[in-house]
């Protein structure tokens, strides 16, 4: 299913800001939504650790089948979260803590 323009543009903006803030420190990429239904939208890798983020246009946006399953499944040994504009700073702060990255670098890009 195609993403709404709002979600797609938010996702692109988030990915761009992450890549710029942590250039050389992370690999951040989108997943292919057509491959496995429910796999989170973004994969961020830093050293031996990884994070999976499921991007939503808002806190009230509906979740698709299997999204919660994959967030919980991979969250056991990695960082996973739903992310939307209302919780962005909290999620990125926690992700930076997980990776050992400086959260202030992201704030400079926001």
Predicted segment positions?
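Catalytic phosphate/metal-binding cores of nucleic-acid and nucleotide-processing enzymes, i.e., regions
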Residues: 1-110
């Amino acid at each position: 299913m195609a993403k709404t323009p709002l979600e797609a543009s938010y996702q692109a903006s988030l990915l761009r800001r992450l890549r710029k803030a942590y250039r050389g420190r992370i690999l951040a990429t989108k997943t292919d939504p057509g491959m496995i239904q429910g796999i989170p939208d973004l994969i961020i890798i830093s050293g031996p650790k990884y994070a999976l983020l499921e991007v939503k246009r808002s806190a009230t946006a509906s979740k698709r089948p299997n999204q919660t399953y994959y967030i919980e499944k991979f969250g056991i040994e990695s960082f996973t979260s739903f992310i939307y504009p209302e919780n962005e700073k909290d999620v990125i702060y926690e992700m930076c803590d997980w990776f050992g990255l400086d959260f202030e670098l992201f704030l400079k890009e926001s």
